[in-house]
A protein has these predicted regions:
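Short, glycine/acidic-enriched loop or turn micro-motifs at the edges of active sites
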Residues: 23-25, 51, 172, 202
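Active-site-adjacent "gating/activation" loops or surface patches in catalytic cores
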Residues: 191-202
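Thiolate-centered catalytic microenvironments shared by cysteine-dependent enzyme domains
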Residues: 60-159
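Short hydrophobic beta-strand segments
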Residues: 18-20, 82-88, 168-169
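Hydrophobic alpha-helical membrane-insertion signals
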Residues: 7-32, 166
C-alpha cells in the first residue's frame, strides 16, 4: 500500500482526485456522509462504503461486480489514468478498504494512495477544510477484476486442510479470540482455524 503525507497532498491537491471514504461501525451512531457534508478536504469526493457494496446478499460490504464498479467510479468523475488519494475520519481505517477496491478492479497501484493520518492529522495540522460541494464531471471508467486477490469460502475451507496460503485476521485480538461479541448482528464470534491475528490498529 502506498501512503502519502499531508504536506504532499497539500502541494498536489489540484492534480489528484481525493476520496473521503469515512465509515463508522453502526453502534457509534456516526455518519461518514454527514461528517463529510460538514467538513472535508477541498476537492474531495465522498465514497459511500455501504451504498457501493453488493446489495443482493446479507453480508455487509461485499464487492460489487465489475460493471457496477465502473458505473460507480464514472459517476464520481474518476478516470483510469487519475492519481487518487483516499482518506477517512474513522477508527476502522475504511480508506484501506476503498484502496483495495480500486486495486481489485484494476486501477494502477502506483496511482492509488492512502493519506497517512487521515482527516484527523490534516485538521490537527490546521490545513484547509471546507463544506463546499465538489464539482464532478462524469467519466467512462473501465474496470476489470483481479480475481486472484479474493478467496471464497470454499477455497478457505479447503485451505484449512491443505495449507496452501496463510490467513491473517485484522480484527482485534479480543474479537479474534471470541472473547467479545461481534459488533454486527448475526455474526458468530471467533476466528478461522489456523489463522493469525494481526490487528489493523497496531
Amino acid at each position: 500500500m502506498s501512503l502519502v503525507e499531508t504536506d504532499w497532498l497539500e502541494k498536489n491537491i489540484s492534480s489528484v482526485k481525493i476520496i473521503d471514504c469515512s465509515w463508522h461501525m453502526p453502534q457509534t451512531k456516526r455518519s461518514g456522509l454527514e461528517e463529510y457534508k460538514n467538513q472535508h478536504i477541498p476537492n474531495s469526493i465522498f465514497f459511500d462504503l455501504d451504498a457501493n457494496s453488493k446489495k443482493e446478499i446479507n453480508l455487509p460490504h461485499m464487492l460489487v461486480d465489475q460493471n457496477e464498479w465502473g458505473q460507480i467510479i464514472s459517476k464520481m468523475g474518476i478516470d483510469n489514468e487519475d492519481e487518487i488519494v483516499i482518506y477517512d475520519n474513522s477508527d476502522v481505517i475504511s480508506s484501506c478498504r476503498c484502496w483495495f477496491n480500486f486495486i481489485y478492479f484494476g486501477h494502477n497501484p502506483k496511482l492509488v494512495h492512502v493519506l497517512n493520518g487521515g482527516l484527523k492529522k490534516w485538521i490537527k495540522e490546521n490545513k484547509e477544510v471546507t463544506n463546499d460541494v465538489t464539482n464532478i464531471k462524469t467519466t467512462d471508467y473501465k474496470s476489470f477484476e483481479k480475481k486472484e486477490l479474493v478467496k471464497n469460502k470454499e477455497q478457505v475451507d479447503l485451505n484449512i486442510e491443505e495449507q496452501y496460503f496463510k490467513v491473517i485476521d485484522a480484527r482485534s485480538k479480543e474479537r479474534f479470540d471470541g472473547k467479545v461479541p461481534e459488533p454486527r448482528k448475526g455474526l458468530r464470534s471467533g476466528s478461522i482455524k489456523d489463522s493469525f491475528c494481526i490487528p489493523f490498529g497496531l
